[in-house]
């Protein structure tokens, strides 16, 4: 609803797509896994109630704001519960090498962003995009299906971690130029990248996101190739700054990844619009 209030003010320069993630991949498998698993984060998992809850939430957003949202395809077999309501899908860093994620992405009729893996190997991401852009025959939900290929499959840069667990960003000018070169050699359709300003790109320093976002737009001013390749930014934002445990009790504060709050988000949206 807050984004809706400023959408019309920036619509000639920016397209806003709310990022509503209903599943949460966990590095160790421990912790809150999102509304799909636990519609009530303080109760036991209930995936039937979770499926109903995530669909109702996306429907409510459309009904009250007109926004169709982005979600992560953590479980390919569950995508059809939301396929009629989403405008964007992301395949995460831990899923991007998975065959079923790639093949399912090839059958979707909306943009699908493929993140670079946590290792940072861009060839893995590019191979995933290639697979998603080609037609396939495969088994999905116990049916043999055929896909036509998804020409809107594209890259998401989210940073990586080295063998010592240190984060390595890949949002800088030089990183995007390398991706431009990979795309030029690939022959892929509709070259595009969305850049994640959090995760390993921020070193999980959530409050660095505004600076990172503005640096990316600065890079687009110094290279036509980058200007044409960068289609968007993925920003983790909510109502309050930071995050809390599921039983923290602060309304509007994330119970998963730390986010920038609404005041910073609103300011950043206007600043990005002015830079366009």
What are these regions (language model features)?
Residues 262-267, 276:
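Mid-to-C-terminal alpha-helical segments outside catalytic/metal-binding sites
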Residues 195, 261:
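Conserved, mostly hydrophobic/aromatic
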Residues 7-178, 199-200, 204-215, 219, ...:
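Active-site-facing alpha/beta catalytic cores
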Residues 190-191:
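Extended serine/threonine-enriched, polar tracts that run as long, contiguous segments within proteins
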Residues 244-256:
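Short helix/strand-capping connector loops at secondary-structure junctions
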Residues 179-184:
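Redox- and metal-dependent alpha/beta enzyme cores, enriched for Fe-S-associated oxidoreductases
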Residues 1-6:
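Short, small-residue-biased leader/transition segments that mark boundaries at the very start
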């Amino acid at each position: 609803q807050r984004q809706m209030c400023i959408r019309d003010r920036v619509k000639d320069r920016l397209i806003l797509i709310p990022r509503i993630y209903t599943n949460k991949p966990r590095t160790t498998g421990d912790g809150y896994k999102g509304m799909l698993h636990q519609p009530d984060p303080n109760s036991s998992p209930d995936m039937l109630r979770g499926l109903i809850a995530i669909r109702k939430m996306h429907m409510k957003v459309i009904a009250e704001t007109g926004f169709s949202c982005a979600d992560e395809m953590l479980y390919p077999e569950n995508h059809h519960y939301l396929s009629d309501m989403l405008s964007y899908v992301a395949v995460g860093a831990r899923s991007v090498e998975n065959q079923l994620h790639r093949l399912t992405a090839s059958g979707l009729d909306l943009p699908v962003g493929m993140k670079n893996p946590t290792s940072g190997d861009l060839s893995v991401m590019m191979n995933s995009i290639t697979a998603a852009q080609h037609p396939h025959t495969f088994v999905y939900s116990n049916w043999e299906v055929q896909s036509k290929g998804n020409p809107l499959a594209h890259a998401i840069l989210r940073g990586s971690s080295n063998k010592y667990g240190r984060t390595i960003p890949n949002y800088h000018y030089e990183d995007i130029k390398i991706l431009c070169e990979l795309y030029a050699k690939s022959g892929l359709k509709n070259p595009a990248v969305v850049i994640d300003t959090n995760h390993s790109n921020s070193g999980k320093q959530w409050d660095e996101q505004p600076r990172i976002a503005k640096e990316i737009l600065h890079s687009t001013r110094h290279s036509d190739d980058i200007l044409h390749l960068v289609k968007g930014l993925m920003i983790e934002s909510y109502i309050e700054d930071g995050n809390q445990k599921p039983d923290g009790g602060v309304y509007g504060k994330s119970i998963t990844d730390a986010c920038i709050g609404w005041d910073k988000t609103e300011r950043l949206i206007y600043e990005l619009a002015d830079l366009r």
